[in-house]
Amino acid sequence: MSSRSDLKIKRVSLIIFLLSVLVEFCYGGFTSEYVRGSDLPDDMPLDSDVFEVPPGPNSPQQVHVTQGNHEGNGVIISWVTPVKPGSKTVQYWCENEKSRKQAEATVNTYRFFNYTSGYIHHCLIDDLEFDTKYYYEIGSGKWSRRFWFFIPPKSGPDVPYTFGLIGDLGQTYDSNSTLSHYEMNPGKGQAVLFVGDLSYADRYPNHDNNRWDTWGRFVERSVAYQPWIWTAGNHEIDFVPDIGEIEPFKPFMNRYHTPHKASGSISPLWYSIKRASAYIIVMSCYSSYGIYTPQYKWLEKELQGVNRTETPWLIVLVHSPFYSSYVHHYMEGETLRVMYEQWFVKYKVDVVFAGHVHAYERSERVSNIAYNIVNGLCEPISDESAPIYITIGDGGNSEGLLTDMMQPQPKYSAFREASFGHGLLEIKNRTHAYFSWNRNQDGNAVAADSVWLLNRFWRAQKKTWLDAF
């Protein structure tokens, strides 16, 4: 009887082990049968209520916050005043305190062709208390405006934290649906990882920068209250020599600051931050990244210095995906992949998020680092040290969805669907995180795709049969 019980236990254990292996390493790629209408999304009109200018002759608008330092206890608060600079002061205070502190913003404007921006304010507030809610007030008199944000807990290996994932948003009716869907999600993130392509102002004649203003007012309802971590996409380049605009990224870099100097970067377009139990590296696909370039040297040093015992979850944000099975934009990220995939495997990056492709896709854990020009080893293979690659360029922009997919579905593709939506990454502890993707047409609590992630660093530290999944 005892031997039978032992045999039964062994069989059950073996089944669990095999199923666990299949969860992460099977090549049963799935293409969703859900079909969304193929009509191109329409941009919302200028008189849409989501673009409404706040009352008052010079009220702050387009308010947004992002992380302000490397450690996580700083913020950059930004806003625009349309007529004159107005007050540069930010008043801020903890939730349970009456006394207020204040900080001063810098102010700048820029010109783009025949457009002149409003007065753009950026205020860095540093050395705030971890795990604390802060209120802040900008403007003056009866036209001042009040918002709040949360400083995350201090970094540690088992600090739970939830990130929202949005990319290629634009300002269409579908964009509004994506943002509303994210806001109403019961598990809404505490910060958003934004993987590039913000306003799509470059789709208008002469890159009409008024559409940067409408976009800033549109997303204010979220980004004024929780930090969005910015990645620059191709629609932020705004390089138009024909009309005399030869400074790449001019509107983006004037409007959206990043804490790049805190991580030793020389450019706002690539940088890193720590937030709770995550270490996030933002890369620029549209800046030089070849060997010996500043971005290359910075990333090489950056990956070597990540302390995975403090921040075990290593996340990379890029705009152009390394792996995609959609026909449009196919292999546009190939040179970046060839350059850096071996590093991502070596340093056990957990997940790479990208946009650019206007659809959703999740990869298996694969790598293609054995290839050279003569050996012919050009197929991606299963690799337990490799990250999962998730493309989430499905925010709703006016270019529409990409529905033409490679057939048959490549083995590296685990799930794909041409729909608009958003993602959530829920970090549970040092070993486990849960990713889910919600299409706009689902109920708020319904995930169209989901996967448990086992941390690559801790998996390597504890190689037992149970760790196989």
UniProtKB/Swiss-Prot annotation:
Zn(2+) binds at D197, N234, H319, H356. Keywords: Disulfide bond, Glycoprotein, Hydrolase, Iron, Metal-binding, Secreted, Signal, Zinc. Belongs to the metallophosphoesterase superfamily. Purple acid phosphatase family. GO terms for cellular component: extracellular region. Its EC number is 3.1.3.2. It comes from Arabidopsis thaliana (Mouse-ear cress). It comes from the Eukaryota. This is Fe(3+)-Zn(2+) purple acid phosphatase 12. Its cofactor is Fe cation; Zn(2+). Expressed in roots, stems, leaves, flowers and siliques. Binds 1 Fe cation per subunit. Homodimer; disulfide-linked. The gene is PAP12. Pfam families: Metallophos, Metallophos_C, Pur_ac_phosph_N. It is an enzyme of class 3 (hydrolase). CDD domains: FN3, MPP_PAPs.
